[in-house]
């Protein structure tokens, strides 16, 4: 794994720690475009009572919102699971 990928996985692990501290299953995710994190997410199912609030889905929704597009061309997703 290259140093950039390692740093992005560390960021995803930080998100997983946030999930754990909120009583969630500790899964975290970051989405990157052009070397920059554009979205983060962690499991929020218990706190939101939303069965779709998995870390990846939360991050994907935030990325799409930020880019104002549903196609996330050129993006990479890093997830702890």
Set out the residue ranges of the language-model regions:
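Short, basic/aromatic recognition patches
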Residues: 1-22
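Zn2+-dependent cytidine deaminase-like catalytic core
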Residues: 3-6, 10, 33, 39-81
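Short, basic and Ser/Thr-rich N-terminal targeting/leader segments
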Residues: 23-27, 73
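Short beta-strand scaffold segments in enzyme catalytic cores
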Residues: 27-35
């Amino acid at each position: 794994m290259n140093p950039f990928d390692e740093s992005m996985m560390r960021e995803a692990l930080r998100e997983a720690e946030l999930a754990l501290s909120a009583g969630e299953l500790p899964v975290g995710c970051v989405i990157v475009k052009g070397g920059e994190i554009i979205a983060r997410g962690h499991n929020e199912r218990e706190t939101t009572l939303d069965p779709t609030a998995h870390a990846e889905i939360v991050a994907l929704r935030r990325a799409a919102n930020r880019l104002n597009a549903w196609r996330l061309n050129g993006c990479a997703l890093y997830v702890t699971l």
